Design a protein with these regions (language model features):
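Conserved TIR/SEFIR loop-to-helix hotspot centered on a Trp-containing motif
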Residues: 63-73
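Conserved N-terminal substructure of TIR/SEFIR domains
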Residues: 1-60
């Protein structure tokens, strides 16, 4: 896994989905919830696994991101 993308769901359409798709098209293996999570997966376990396996992390900082409580995790 090359890159883990952390973001607020409100930022998906405008920024995160296009970013993740572009990185994949360039050959990077990206952990992005819409690419990685499957029906019935534990979100927390999947995130923990993605974080532990990714070489790099990308945090999309926005007002929406900071309004969430989970960034304190």
């Amino acid at each position: 896994m090359d890159l883990f993308i952390s973001h607020a769901s409100e930022d998906k359409d405008l920024l995160v989905r296009p970013l993740a798709a572009r990185l994949r098209s360039l050959g990077y293996e990206v952990w992005y919830d819409e690419f990685t999570l499957r029906l019935g997966d534990s979100l927390r376990r999947s995130i923990d696994k993605g974080l532990s396996q990714a070489r790099y992390g990308c945090v999309v900082l926005s007002e929406s991101f900071f309004a969430k409580q989970w960034p304190q995790y």
